[in-house]
Amino acid sequence: MAAPGEALTSSGYIAHHLSNLSLYKLGLVGSETSFWNVHIDSLFFSWFTGLIFLGIFYKVAKRTTAGVPGKLQCAVEMIVEFVADNVKDTFHGRNPLIAPLALTIFCWVFLMNVMDLVPIDFLPYPAEHWLGIPYLKVVPSADVNITMAMALGVFALMIYYSIKVKGLGGFAKELALHPFNHPLMIPFNLLIEVVSLLAKPLSLGMRLFGNMFAGEVVFILCAAMLPWYLQWMGSLPWAIFHILVITIQAFVFMMLTIVYLSMAHEDSDH
């Protein structure tokens, strides 16, 4: 931020809005790269959107009726059926937890992405001037720590179900003897399979982060480069297009999760 009485430049405005409220910024850890440098705003808004998801679905579940459903119940039922159909078409194992997991991921990621449509200064301005909070980023999925944490969670489930379904020996055999089933090719197979395995969570998390971070940067540029009375001319068309991006990214994250877990449930001899 600029010093008191000093005008904030466009570059300063952009840098400020791309900065997280972290323990380092509050002087609670000594380094910005410290493992303990938690991004408080990203955690808060990820929890906030998660609670919204739980609240909506809990409310609908309690008020579900066999009669004429309300608009909210219809919307929730459409989402549930949409996710269930995709799981049925994509997941070929037997696991009753996959559909609820896919539903949670789709709705949670979608709600985190939707925060990108909140006007740039709508929450940061009152937070800074009324509450004394110097930095506030409201889009959790534009924080690589959040997206990679979710991707690593999916990765942990992949490893867990691979070992559970195939056995530790079967999982090791899959890494060592595929794609070339010959002892001399084991080092080459391991190199290919381990890189492929590690690339899954990396691409899963970075894809979501990259798309949402880029969208956030465009909104910030519109706010920084245009006078307030013209900002809508840049932000509105991008917001309309971004609605599609928000939905697609949530869908892609969900579908890749289903695909990866389906692969983990496949028999090693498949």
UniProtKB/Swiss-Prot annotation:
It is found in: Cell inner membrane. It comes from the Bacteria. GO terms for biological process: proton motive force-driven plasma membrane ATP synthesis. The keyword Cell membrane applies. GO terms for cellular component: plasma membrane; proton-transporting ATP synthase complex. GO terms for molecular function: proton-transporting ATP synthase activity, rotational mechanism. It is a multi-pass membrane protein. Its main location: membrane. InterPro entries: ATP_syn_F0_a_bact/chloroplast, ATP_synth_F0_asu, ATP_synth_F0_asu_AS, F0_ATP_A_sf. Keywords: ATP synthesis, Cell inner membrane, Cell membrane, CF(0), Hydrogen ion transport, Ion transport, Membrane, Transmembrane, Transmembrane helix, Transport. The chain crosses the membrane at residues 38-58, 98-118, 143-163, 208-228, 239-259. Belongs to the ATPase A chain family. PANTHER family: ATP SYNTHASE SUBUNIT A, CHLOROPLASTIC (PTHR42823:SF3). Key component of the proton channel; it plays a direct role in the translocation of protons across the membrane. F-type ATPases have 2 components, CF(1) - the catalytic core - and CF(0) - the membrane proton channel. CF(1) has five subunits: alpha(3), beta(3), gamma(1), delta(1), epsilon(1). CF(0) has three main subunits: a(1), b(2) and c(9-12). The alpha and beta chains form an alternating ring which encloses part of the gamma chain. CF(1) is attached to CF(0) by a central stalk formed by the gamma and epsilon chains, while a peripheral stalk is formed by the delta and b chains. This is ATP synthase subunit a. The gene is atpB.
